[in-house]
Amino acid sequence: VCSSDLIIGPDKDVPAPDVNTNGQIMAWIADEYAALSGKWEPGVVTGKPLATGGSLGRNEATGRGLLFTLETWCEKNHKKMDGLTMAVQGFGNVGSVGSLLIHRQGVKVVCVGDINGTWYNPNGLDIEAMYVYANSHGRSLKGYTEAGATIIPDMDLFSQDVDVLFMAAMENQLNEKTMELVKAKLVLEGDNEIGRAHV
């Protein structure tokens, strides 16, 4: 942002929080933009704290949007969410919130992977417990244990026989190698780019 040639703005590119950012960093960007442009524009970035013009629903907005996407897919394909199965790659803000909201609609999440490992339980993982654990451990599942869950190789996440593969990790995780493994009927895209050149 430290430039007189502003490439972001409320009517240009509006940054949002992503990997390794948070509300404080978004507030700093908005503050720096105000210093350079000479005016306070709350719409220059999303994800700011409430005290600096943030939105009450921002933390869960992307995850909730993915819930709506899955609901729409179910309606168009004459399926009920209750009883669907899902595997999730990535359990940061998007993955954890999205998984929690989707799970609460009756979807059984059997596999969750993050940078620390991949957990599997054919009877369904305890997403409520995983959500609480991750949010109290810096959005990390490192050290998480659960009765009935096993740690499986990370690549096995892609080959789970599930209805939905929820991609919420870093971009380009689906590629020629991993796409060949996918059995899911739907890839729910919660990351920035799943690897469009290969899909």
Regions found by a protein language model. Name each.
Residues 1-3:
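Short, small-residue-biased leader/transition segments that mark boundaries at the very start
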Residues 5-17, 38-41:
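Short secondary-structure capping/junction motifs at helix and strand boundaries
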Residues 169-197:
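Rossmann-fold NAD(P)-binding glycine/threonine-rich loop
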Residues 160-161, 183:
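Alpha-helix C-terminal capping/helix-to-coil transition sites in glycosyltransferase folds
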Residues 18-26:
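Structural/interface elements that position substrates and couple domains in central-metabolism enzymes
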Residues 34-46:
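Acidic-glycine-rich active-site phosphate/pyrophosphate-binding loop
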Residues 46-49, 54-60, 64-158:
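Glycine-rich phosphate/diphosphate-binding loop of Rossmann-like nucleotide-binding domains
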Residues 163-164, 186:
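Short, Asp-centered acidic motifs that coordinate Mg2+ and/or phosphate
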